[in-house]
Amino acid sequence: MNLDFIKEESPMGFSTSTCTEFVEVLSSKAPVPGGGGASALVGAVGTALGNMVGSLTVGKKKYADVEEEMWELKKKCDQLQKDFLHLIERDAEVFEPLSKAYGMPRETEEEKAEKARVMEAALKEACSVPMEIMEKCCEAIELIVEFGAKG
């Protein structure tokens, strides 16, 4: 179901805001960012920390035997980090229609039915990004464990 009709054109930009700005908006009553965006941010920070281990490991004689593997891990973490940052924005985008759907009128039976239909579609869409964030977190954990074992 296309929910574009209840979206407003508004640039989010949460992934490029300062930490202070993000946390201030997160702590407000604004509908976004929310838990999904915060989770994606934590995922990006976690992968960045894994990459830090990789950066501190490559180029050292002591770790020469795992250097190629570390570069490959860093490459994978770089991509996950980008994915997480994108998911901050994506979570806000998919939550906006749900937020608006909550405010739909429900006076008549037709309005109630329409709201229920829109809510179901909006809920499915809004849940898709947190699910993707969880999947990416599982990928990141595997990489972090490998960084820890080799770095």
Regions found by a protein language model. Give the residues of each.
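Long, contiguous binding/interaction regions
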Residues: 2-12, 114, 118
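Short, hydrophobic/aliphatic alpha-helical segments
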Residues: 14-33, 149
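Amphipathic, well-ordered alpha-helical segments in soluble domains
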Residues: 18, 22, 45-52, 87, ...
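Conserved phosphate/anionic-ligand binding catalytic regions in large, soluble enzymes, centered on
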Residues: 28-51
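Amphipathic alpha-helix face/heptad-repeat signature
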Residues: 41-45, 73, 80-87, 122, ...
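Transmembrane signal-anchor/signal-peptide helices with a preference for the extracytoplasmic
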Residues: 52-64
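A structural-propensity feature for long, helix-poor, extended segments
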Residues: 61-103
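Amphipathic alpha-helical interface segments
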Residues: 91, 95-151
